[in-house]
């Protein structure tokens, strides 16, 4: 199920900045997905973006994975050297979680084509702020 983020009570500036970082990470990683690329290279890109922003210690899971009969299949977007192939159904799901502050995760499902990543999920990545 795709994951999207909402801020309740307006969100602090740190939470809003964190959301912008995760969204940028998602967008840059999606743009880097092409047939023949190693999943590990996309993962390294995500680690660099988040690490350069000072949040590397709070990004402790994989970036995404293949989906098939099982929800977690190859290729993996982590430290593995799985090759991304045309027709692979994958998730892209960067997330950063800060104790005492909150967490942000954006997750989409899609397929790898000759031209890159084509998302199945069409939910906008706009941040929804709910004032209570």
Kindly label every feature range from the protein language model.
Residues 1-132:
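Active-site neighborhoods and metal-handling regions in enzymes and metal-associated proteins
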């Amino acid at each position: 199920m795709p994951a999207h983020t909402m801020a309740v009570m307006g969100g602090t500036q740190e939470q809003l900045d964190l959301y912008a970082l995760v969204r940028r990470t998602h967008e840059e990683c999606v743009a880097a997905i092409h047939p023949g690329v190693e999943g590990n290279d996309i993962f390294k890109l995500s680690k660099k973006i988040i690490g350069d922003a000072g949040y590397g210690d709070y990004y402790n899971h994989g970036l995404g994975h293949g989906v098939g009969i099982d929800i977690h299949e190859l290729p993996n977007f982590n430290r593995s050297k799985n090759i991304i192939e045309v027709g692979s159904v994958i998730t892209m799901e960067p997330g950063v979680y800060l104790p005492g502050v909150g967490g942000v995760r954006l997750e989409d499902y899609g397929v790898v084509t000759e031209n890159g990543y084509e998302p199945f999920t069409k939910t906008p990545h706009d941040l929804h702020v709910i004032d209570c």
